[in-house]
């Protein structure tokens, strides 16, 4: 799902898949965000959490002794975010809930 917001200067689009911006345009229609080109990089502005990049052997050690596999660029960029609320003239808020099928990568979640 894609949500659009605008004011007198800008319009933006936010995609619920990955919770990422997909467009930033000025009032004249000039696009400021990379729109993706499969020849180079089809992505746009991914949310990279809790890491940016790769881990050695794709492993993270949590709490000193708990080892989990963590994909490149973290766990959020390929997940569906839930729209909590929106006033499309001002803001929209997306939530991402813990997925029980995925390991817990950090201990302070939700505190």
Language-model regions, residue ranges each:
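Surface-exposed acidic/polar loop and edge beta-strand patches at domain peripheries
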Residues: 1-110
């Amino acid at each position: 799902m894609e949500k659009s917001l605008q004011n007198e200067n800008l319009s933006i689009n936010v995609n619920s898949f990955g919770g990422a911006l997909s467009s930033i345009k000025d009032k004249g229609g000039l696009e400021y965000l990379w729109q993706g080109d499969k020849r180079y990089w089809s992505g746009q502005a991914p949310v990279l959490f809790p890491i940016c990049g790769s881990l050695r052997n794709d492993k993270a050690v949590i709490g000193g002794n708990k080892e989990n596999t963590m994909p490149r660029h973290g766990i959020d960029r390929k997940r569906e975010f839930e729209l909590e609320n929106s006033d499309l003239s001002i803001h929209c808020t997306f939530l991402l809930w813990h997925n029980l099928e995925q390991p817990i990568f950090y201990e302070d979640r939700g505190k």
